[in-house]
Amino acid sequence: MTAEEVCIYTRIAGDKVGATRMDRPEDIEPSPKTGKVYAALTNNKYRGKASPDNSGKTQDNKAAKKTDGAGRPYEDATEVAPITENKNGLVLEMEDDHAGTKGKWNLLLVCGDPNEAYTYFGGFDKESVSPISCPDNVAFDEYGNLWVSTDGNALDSNDGLFAVAVEGERRGETKCFLTVPVAAETCGPQIFSNRVMVNVQHPGEIETDQGHPVGDNPDPTTNPTSHWPDGGKEQPRPAVVQVVRTDGKKIGV
């Protein structure tokens, strides 16, 4: 492949050199405190399921080697995605010489309902965490806490922004900071000592496969799922939200 082809067909180039296949990586960010790198892997509903066209070309699975009873190829659970039909996503943690030829990683979060056995929250007590699904963007505050915004929540709840401790005895503790309107996506968080800024994308969007109440009219311009931010009967609009702490205390402590 030429250098130009590598830039355009990056996933194919990665397969050729044996890169680790992941479940829809959406964002990546290094910790300003430790240098560890964190990646949000949103989900992969095809993992462990036969490909719709029997070709094996489902998501990150171009040449599946396993088949189901009907001979259809599928992508099985792997070490990097230890569950089949990964609906809720993962947060990957990498720590190594990033200029080296080899690296090491582990999973900080295996997202989903804490009551489910497959979920993992960095070793923290699962009875004391906020459920999180479909991590999309990641950011850090000045104290080294990871903040995760979500997109496409598969737990029948709205998307939101979550703070996650990555070091110390509270490692893996996940706290919901805010949620966005139904069918909207939380993205692009920016964390400061006294305020948090976040984007609210496509509020009012109709997603019938997720069971949102669309009635008999699937047109989001006439029957949106919300009227945020103006309310009433106004058209929903994307917006940037700023949450400000007014008591003088800092966010993330």
Pin down the residues of each PLM region.
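Sequence/structural signature of beta-propeller domains
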Residues: 1-253
